[in-house]
Amino acid sequence: MSEDRHLIETPLSRTELLRGNFLHVVRDTVLMPNGAEATREYVLHPGAVMIIGLLDDGRVVLERQFRHPMQTVMIEFPAGKLDEGEDSLACAQRELLEETGYSAREWAFAGRLAPTVAYSDETIDIWFARSLTLGERQLDDGEFLDVFTATPAELRAWCFGGEVIDSKTLIGSMWLQNVQAGEWALQWKDAAASPLAGQSAP
């Protein structure tokens, strides 16, 4: 927006610092609004999805997974990174099935979050899924996680008490609370009547 011109930095050049199996790190030289130059180091990311799976009994699908950088087991909503050329919903459908064994008949896009704006361009699309059917998980090699269910009230209590500190799951809990309270509306689509794979998030 034009009123933000006094805040915006202009990219001048880029140096690649690391291209690993998981991380792609670059250093940009930028022109700041005051005319001085500065460097910005950050992670390039293809994007990711998070799935809030709603069971017919009102419970939600969650995972417990060890996160090496944190050196602890985290409670999280199912989530995963976009494959090259993959659209958001197809990724959500794939990740839900692979990690939890659930497939969903109805899907709704909720919104998008940027979890680490200071050092990554990653965004996470938030998807709700309902009318779930449980099948067999298809975990990747080297992927270890437990799937469990909880009530929304239990999840909120864990967020308040500090048992849940994963940022995307905290945001997901906020979305869940507002959707169930009728404050935020979702547009549900029936995957059985009209396959959604191939559609992207708005």
Predicted region positions:
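Extreme N-terminal tail/first-helix region
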Residues: 1-19, 190, 195-199
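Hydrophobic residues on conserved beta-strands that form the core of alpha/beta folds
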Residues: 25-27, 39, 63, 77, ...
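Short loop segments at secondary-structure junctions
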Residues: 34, 55-57, 66, 129-134, ...
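A glycine-rich, hydrophobic loop/mini-helix early in the fold
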Residues: 46-72, 76-77
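Charged phosphate-binding loop/patch that engages nucleotide di/tri-phosphates or the phosphate backbone
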Residues: 172-190, 194
